[in-house]
Amino acid sequence: MAERFFPLDSGSATWGSTISQAWDVTQAETASGRRRAICNQVFPKTTFNLSFPALSDADVNKLLGFYSKCKGTLLPFWYKDYGSRVEMQKIYRNSDGAYQCYTDQGGYILACEYVDNVRVYVDNIETLDFTVNGGLMNVPGAKPASVVTACYDYYWRVRFDGNLSVTQTFADINSVSVKLVTVR
């Protein structure tokens, strides 16, 4: 996947965000009340409903151009939600010696596919000797018995879900609502 990033920074534009999660469960219930259910999903379907009530014409042009580059709902991209930050979390070494970044959502662990703004600590001492590749980190100075913790921002791999429409409210003030859905 080419590295495409949502063009509007959540900190630079006025916005609102609603996050919802869904699991597609097929179920059947007998007359006696016995229930059978199955779920084919491994990961939840997370949806972001974003509203930008006051975008400038320049920001709207960026967003429209980005929507066109993604061919509407076809191509996925990276989106960083305002709350997508991990603070001082222990990360674990895999069999290759790399450390997988993850987010813990109330005990449900999701691997992070892309992170930035990373700070790494080996045995509570900050180190600058590390590399990041997507959601994996290599920390050459960490021994297998070392405790590695990290702080990072993580991105969601998403696509647009539906059309993009812009409402002009005043000169150089536009309102836009966007729906994004996670993809794997």
Model-derived features: positions:
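Expand to "…catalyze enediolate/carbanion chemistry for C-C bond making/breaking, isomerization
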Residues: M137
